[in-house]
């Protein structure tokens, strides 16, 4: 059986429905031909030029990312801009690009739940429920600890679990953590929801000074593990879901995880 782009779109959307995306978001097939056959799939967090080149080199004509390459409507597509160069190269090499973003964050067993599991916990509740969801879904998860941890212990667990060199945090290292919220990626818009839930700590990425300063004053610890650090699980989630679905269909289309999609930040 030949796998077409439209078949792959249906598989992804069956697991992470487009209806679950946040209103500001853009998800789905970004570039491509729904009737084209899929030879091989590459998964990545971002559709960088390095990822595109890797897909070409490894004969992958389908790239699936978490972050949409077309987040905002471009005013033009030319070789004068980075985005234009990417899209032209994608089209010139007959590559299809699909993105599952906040819908993959929200869905049950999506990125939020994957992050909780990676941290070593198996029970959580939804932080901000998605009212459009037929089943339970929403942004962020709240974990109630059966045994308290100190902030230092939680920071150490985050570093070890996410395999990151360093992180930023606020709060007393000896602070007792009874519950915490996980909001992968840029989670500041949901900090207030976390505060209302009474959590002692928020784990996220991409925090800004004034937000953290305010929540520090409110005695809520914040652990900033970076945008890449908290969202690389998206690649793992998507790859496993696709492998399982294709196996059931008797399709052996190769699925490769990009080796070129790395955190742009370096640390000294």
Swiss-Prot record:
GO MF terms here are:
metal ion binding
Q: Does the keyword Metal-binding apply?
A: yes
Q: Kindly list the residue ranges recorded as spanning the membrane.
A: none
Record bears the keyword Metal-binding: yes
The record's family statement is: Belongs to the GTP cyclohydrolase I type 2/NIF3 family.
Keywords, A to Z, come to: Metal-binding
Name a single GO cellular component.
cytoplasm
Q: Name one Pfam family in it.
A: DUF34_NIF3
User: Which residues bind a divalent metal cation 2 per the record?
Assistant: 67, 227, 231
Complexes and interactors: Homohexamer.
Q: Which InterPro entries match?
A: DUF34/NIF3, DUF34/NIF3_sf
Q: Which residues bind a divalent metal cation 1?
A: 66, 105, 231
What is the protein's name according to its record?
Answer: GTP cyclohydrolase 1 type 2 homolog
Gene3D superfamilies associated with the record: NIF3 (NGG1p interacting factor 3)-like
